Amino acid sequence: MKSFYNITYRYFRAPWDIGARDELVLLVETGRIKPSRAIDLGCGTGANAIYLAQNGFDVTGVDYAEAAIEKARSRANEANVTVNFIVDDLTNLRHVSGTFDFLLDYGVLDDLRLHQREPYLRNMLPLTHAGSQFLLWGFEYPMRWWEKFVPFYDIPFQPGEIEQRFGSYFEIEKIAGRIDYSKWPPGYATYLMTRKGEATK
């Protein structure tokens, strides 16, 4: 998958590279997410990270695709903003330290195989503190029976999966989503979470 993303970012315009995402913009504009120390988990070419920097956030962006980080740094320079872009693996972080007030994941966790999602959580939790907010977007819909036989088709979140994985650590609010099998993707969901009590790893 890493080679796929590097080739896509280096030679093409990724179809998901569509600028700052609507839910993020709305949360910032309405003040639900306030300028703070933020990290974009799987930042791609940096659209969301750059938007946050333009709105007063102290931003770190992380992606394991070197080609994406190269483009992100160039775009931040063109936008005349400062973002700390880092090449790192979200299932085995080595170059990110400290905690963040706001964490953002648009389409990374749902792109991980099922066996990679627990390592993601173990690496993400130490980046939070009590009160940290986490915005998570991903494909979410009940898999149809035949999809279980399609290779690499364990991508979508299953209903209840986010609550099961994150509920012990976060208060969870589902702020957007739909399921419609006549469209692609058949379903998606956006969650805004707040880290509970005293943060524990």
State where each predicted segment sits:
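Short catalytic micro-motifs in class I SAM-dependent methyltransferases
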Residues: 107-111
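Class I (Rossmann-like) S-adenosyl-L-methionine-dependent methyltransferase catalytic domain
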Residues: 1-39, 45-95, 112-123, 127, ...
